[in-house]
Amino acid sequence: MKANCFSRTPVATLVIMAIFSTPVIAADKKSQVINNFQVMTVTAPTSSPLTIISSPKTPRQPVPASDGSDYLKTIPGFSQIRNGGTNGDPVFRGMFGSRLRILTNNSEMLGACPSRMDAPSSYISPESFDLLTLTKGPQTVLWGPGNSAGTVRFEQERPYFEHADIKGTASALAASNDRWDVNADISMGNQLGYLRLTGNKSHANDYKDGDGHPVPSKWSKWNTDIALGWTPDEYTLLELTAGKGDGEARYAGRGMDGSQFKRDSLGLRIEKSNIGEVFDKFEANIYYNYADHVMDNYSLRSPSQMMGGHSGGHSTGHITGHMPMVSAKHSGHSMSMKMPMAMELDRKTVGGRMMGSWIWSDFELQSGADMQINTHRSKRNNQWNKDARFQDYGIFSELTWKATEQSSLISGARVDRVLVNKYASMNSAERTDTLPAGFIRFEHTLAEKPIMLYAGIGYTERFPDYWELFSPTYGPGGTHNVFNAVKSEKTRQLDIGAQYSGKQINGWISAYIGQVDNFILFRYDAHNARISQVDNINATIMGGEMGMSYQITDTWKTDASLAYAWGENTSDHHALPQMPPLETRLTLGWQKDKWSSTGLLRLVSRQGRIAINQGNVVGKDFDSSAGYAVFSANAAYQLNDYIKLSSGVDNLFDKTYSEHLNLAGNSGFGYSSEQPINELGRTFWAKLNVTF
């Protein structure tokens, strides 16, 4: 008999932990569009289908893990490649990796693992931030180069104080599989400045799938951050930030687990607004992010004789233990991992950005420059060895012309200079490139109807990232010189969309079609999954997202969303790999006074358009996938202006299913070489949110 129940946490403890752990919702216009009352099940655009803005603090269903990727999954168009219980890799519109830039407070945190065991999103604790903003496609140039799929920004807003005060929010979550999360975000200050403290801790044991089988997936994480701000007036800000974090995670789909995810962060930002009649605002920030990652096969599991599936590391990392050092890339699919082994790698990322805003007549210009330097190292014989350094220097401008009351024309351009060094004892090398990007978009709101329309075309070039240059065994044409052979991607994409905002009905649609030259593709050896070849092909992509909400009565409301992504390898005339299937979400919600309740039905079709043994540095297509339907439900009660209690059950009918984007389970846990990792079975959860 299957059983899934809460860890037995007394309600009093839950309340006390929530009250002494808390976040700040600052008084910004963007915050006002976020509705924190209900549990979020479908994320819809607020003003344009091109941009999604939501609050990471709002309870979500299905209840996400503690990392950024699982939160992004609640937005139509997003999916993830599952490793275990946490630290999945986000995918938007079928696009993966550095095609999707993920920023926190205008800084980038890059992981160290050559196979992305510690993806950038794994270092993000979403509830520490006030806003989550997604810009789809290459329709902005403000946030770095090569963002062909989109740009995701997690932001903390400046807390405002009219007098000496303390305020914040807190949350505590208890769920099946001994899940227990606490989050704190507290600000104190006055008109001249503030101190903001954020912290969180998250823990879960292995979950069970719908058949009651345990899936190796336990994790434990913590993060803490501090921000000290000086605000001599309402138009001036000088803020210093610092943060640390660590954790561990067990992975069903890898030959090693993550036993360390150390994070160190420093930042400084300056903002000055309302400067003059034309020069309106200046903002600048610099940051330092450091990731120190350890993976091993003994901290969270017992070393087994054979470890198939993803090894968790490649030749850029070095295995240490009671056996000679082995390069996982050349070790073969039947590499013996009976002996305890570990790999330690790190990455230091330093960057900065400055931008000015000018407003005159019907024009607004945003122009500036940014830069980033990141260095990757691996540890061998207790000594750090540098293997790669990436440098990027860019300038950018965006111009908005309010042509009429209903029409706007937005355009932008940027150019980046990239320098990459490969450090090796025998064949060190250097590459440089210049990357142009630009877009133009027309937006129009009908005069007599609540309909907004837009169409934009964008172009961007993306230099190969660390994982595409240093992780593969071979390069295009089978060359061993991967570093010099992989070309930069070039994406041309048309984005169109519309939004209708009525009294009872709201609807939106965003669609795209694009051509990608030199699309970077991984091909895996059919007999040895650790041997890979990276190649450049040409591809066509298209798809979109759409949604609708209908206010049936004052208390009843229904929402629906649909997302679809399609890709074709036009060089080889077959499907592009790692494309998520058609997905639909249907919700029916009820709200009256302080009570609310929602039912969510998630429908996913089968995916038969696959490219066997092709994919990216993390995942590959190894089989078609079946469709499924999963039903979840929740209820929430607003006790007063300060306390909200929500609870729910995910996968109510205990469905056994797996996502199409998936890692094959690891043989050390009893999985076959092409057996996907199943999703969570029935999961109960309860969450307490406190605001003061």
PLM segments and residue spans:
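Outer membrane beta-barrel strand-and-loop segments of large Gram-negative receptors
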Residues: 225, 334-356, 392-396, 483-487, ...
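Flexible loop and strand-edge segments within Gram-negative outer membrane beta-barrel domains
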Residues: 204, 217-219, 235-282, 289-309, ...
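Periplasmic-side early beta-strands and strand-to-turn transitions of outer-membrane beta-barrels
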Residues: 153-155, 160-163, 169, 180, ...
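Gram-negative outer-membrane beta-barrel transporters
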Residues: 402-409, 511-516, 534-614, 653
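Surface-exposed extracellular loop regions of Gram-negative outer-membrane beta-barrel proteins
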Residues: 246-248, 290-292, 375, 417-426, ...
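Short acidic/polar hinge/loop motifs at secondary-structure boundaries
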Residues: 108-136
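N-terminal periplasmic "start-of-domain" segments of outer-membrane beta-barrel proteins
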Residues: 33-71, 89, 225
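N-terminal periplasmic accessory domains that precede
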Residues: 59-62, 66-72, 88-91, 103, ...
